[in-house]
Amino acid sequence: MFTVLIPIQLICIILLSIPASAAEGALEKAKLGRVSWSSFQCATWADMSGNKKEHAPLFVVGLKAGREFINAVRSGQVTAKLAKQEAPIEVTTLLEGPSTDFLLGRIFQSAGLDAYDKIVKEENGILLEPSKWINDKELIKTKAQTRYLNGNCAALKEKVDRGGKSKTKSN
């Protein structure tokens, strides 16, 4: 009798842990929407600050994270509700289109424009009048460097350098 109970208990433990690990996996994949958005913004700030070598690795992080996020949403691994809870609204409103790469292009464009606007067209989150938009290249560079530093962009880059999930062959 004991020998029968042990395998049954083991099976029950395994079966009960599957939904939890699936939910954890879905949560991690849902968070990739934010990683993608942030990486694309950081790539833009790196570019604007004259740090061109940081642009490509951050772009790749955004591309890989975004692709995994979109594929998880499309396959149903991540529900629409979970995606809306974990990913920025700017990402979740752009999830309609013919292909994953099309959606990634839309997200990249939107994140880049948002990052640019935060440097050139906004002050403390408030949109400036067009006459007050910044056009001084050095000031733009300085503000972009500050955003890059304050936006934890180096942490995304370090993840790539340390061999994290987003490590690319070109690094």
Language-model segments: residues:
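Short amphipathic alpha-helical segments and their helix-coil junctions
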Residues: 20-31, 126-133
